[in-house]
Amino acid sequence: MLLEEKFLEFHRYASSHNLPLEAISVGDENKVLCEMHYAANAPRNIYSHTKSFTVTAVGLAMEEGKLSLEDHVAEVFKDKLPSNPDPNLEKIQLKHLLCMSSGFGKALLMNEDRRPGVGAPDYEKYMMAQPVPVEPGSAFCYSSADSILAAHMVCLLYTSPSPRDRSLS
């Protein structure tokens, strides 16, 4: 009972001081002992959590044999390529996107690029037209664009023939 009393005491303190809490949970190695969610129905920006969802979806697609870390971005989005794509663009593989080492060399679709309209409505076409000054796989550069492209690769698998099927036709 002491744990529940201390937990409620903390809850009252947090509430009375308007602490910006999302949730609090106390558990041992086997189960949740006490838990409280604040503003559970309030929308929130989850930022980098999206990357976790994307890599999970990639893993599931790989498990089904629909996707490989070796798949090339330019092959998947070949209908979005400009007439003269950057030679390094054709070297970018899914594994580079997941490790944020695509070679774009800067954080795309972030910071000032977050304003409405940048890259929209066709992110794939926008990204395929970007210069790739760094050898893919050689340098880390945090970029939302890498995650967006990886997520779009997965989306294509479940909304149209798979990239492998398209490349065989």
Regions found by a protein language model. Name each.
Residues Y158-D165:
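Conserved small/polar residues in nucleotide/adenosyl-binding loops
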Residues L33, P82, R166:
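Flexible, glycine-rich phosphate/dinucleotide-binding loops
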Residues M1-L2:
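Basic/polar N-terminal segments that are highly enriched at the extreme N-terminus
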Residues K6-A40, L69:
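A short, well-structured edge-of-sheet supersecondary motif
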Residues R12-H17, P43-T50, G59-Y142:
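Active-site-proximal loop and beta-strand segments within enzyme catalytic domains
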Residues F53-T56, A145-M153:
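Well-ordered alpha-helical segments within folded domains of soluble proteins
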